[in-house]
């Protein structure tokens, strides 16, 4: 009699994805972030569902409904802060996951990589809309500033912005539709995650060497299930330390002031995980140019397979490329810092230089250095 795990139509899918899946024997902890993102997604959907039970998406009551959740709902405060800080953990894992893909050349799995980039855009859109829902000052002004960027699109820009707003300013209609989109998008993301995994399992995982591991595979369970569980426990530990000790560390104090269209906060800035892109946006004096740079700063990931000039897939044996990679990481951290600073003398020029370096590294320096390394291999 065959094992039900291998014969049952549903169990078979789970078995082939998480139990009997042949996995490379040498994948490091950088390969943990995929499963951690799954944990984050489940956590966000669950906490979000419980928050949605008590939240009202109306401009008059949205702010007080969030206050009500924190004060009156049983454990509402912990659910709210787990959801808010869970988003931060989500983005930490996302950026680590993308960084791993760049370092080890995982972008050569074209379908998996492209679905991943679409997922990144969708998670960013979801997080942005979620930030608007508490209807604090930064929620309102963040929504106003970011949606207004679309008015830079020639000819249709103004109509497009008013269509998204559902009126002539960010108001009740905007909040209601943002809540609807914020609720539905995670489920679309979940479906896309399955597509992402489907494409990944067509080829199998990459590994730190970038060399085919077909001759040295081990079953996913128990080796990587136990490794993923350890990773998940550490993630939850980090999240709970954040939630229970410094829940407002990553938030903006302005969001504890109810939204007021007549009073602009001195410094409008998004959540920390968007600051690098915000810095790139602000570093270009022209509105349309800034918007294009903002979109390209993420969309550039799609070009990574085209920009790969090296004969080797991974950066493991390419010290010069490694230097550039870590320079890119440092540059992104610099941009993140600049994005949170006011627009004044030293910060403007630092932001512009960091933005130029960002595009220069990816589009010019990395391919050039890869070509040089190819020539060094001949010596």
Curated annotation (Swiss-Prot):
Record-level GO cellular component terms: mitochondrial inner membrane; respiratory chain complex III
Q: Molecular function (GO) terms listed?
A: metal ion binding; ubiquinol-cytochrome-c reductase activity
GO BP: any one term: mitochondrial electron transport, ubiquinol to cytochrome c
The record's free-text note on cofactor binding: Binds 2 heme b groups non-covalently.
Which amino acid positions bind a ubiquinone, per UniProt? 201
Q: In which residues is heme b b566 bound? A: 97, 196
Q: What is an example of a Pfam family matching this protein? A: Cytochrom_B_C
Q: Which keywords does UniProt give here?
A: Electron transport, Heme, Iron, Membrane, Metal-binding, Mitochondrion, Mitochondrion inner membrane, Respiratory chain, Transmembrane, Transmembrane helix, Transport, Ubiquinone
Q: Where are the transmembrane segments?
A: 33-53, 77-98, 113-133, 178-198, 226-246, 288-308, 320-340, 347-367
Q: Where in the cell is it found?
A: Mitochondrion inner membrane
Answer whether the UniProt record assigns the keyword Electron transport to this protein.
Answer: yes
- Is Transferase one of the keywords? no
- Residue positions annotated to bind heme b b562 are 83, 182
Q: Which cofactor does it need?
A: heme b
Membrane-related topology note: Multi-pass membrane protein
Its UniProt miscellaneous note says: Heme 1 (or BL or b562) is low-potential and absorbs at about 562 nm, and heme 2 (or BH or b566) is high-potential and absorbs at about 566 nm.
PANTHER family, A to Z: CYTOCHROME B
Role description: Component of the ubiquinol-cytochrome c reductase complex (complex III or cytochrome b-c1 complex) that is part of the mitochondrial respiratory chain. The b-c1 complex mediates electron transfer from ubiquinol to cytochrome c. Contributes to the generation of a proton gradient across the mitochondrial membrane that is then used for ATP synthesis.
The family annotation for this protein states: Belongs to the cytochrome b family.
The record describes its quaternary structure and partners as: The cytochrome bc1 complex contains 11 subunits: 3 respiratory subunits (MT-CYB, CYC1 and UQCRFS1), 2 core proteins (UQCRC1 and UQCRC2) and 6 low-molecular weight proteins (UQCRH/QCR6, UQCRB/QCR7, UQCRQ/QCR8, UQCR10/QCR9, UQCR11/QCR10 and a cleavage product of UQCRFS1). This cytochrome bc1 complex then forms a dimer.
Q: What is this protein called?
A: Cytochrome b
The beginning of the lineage is: Eukaryota, Metazoa, Chordata, Craniata, Vertebrata
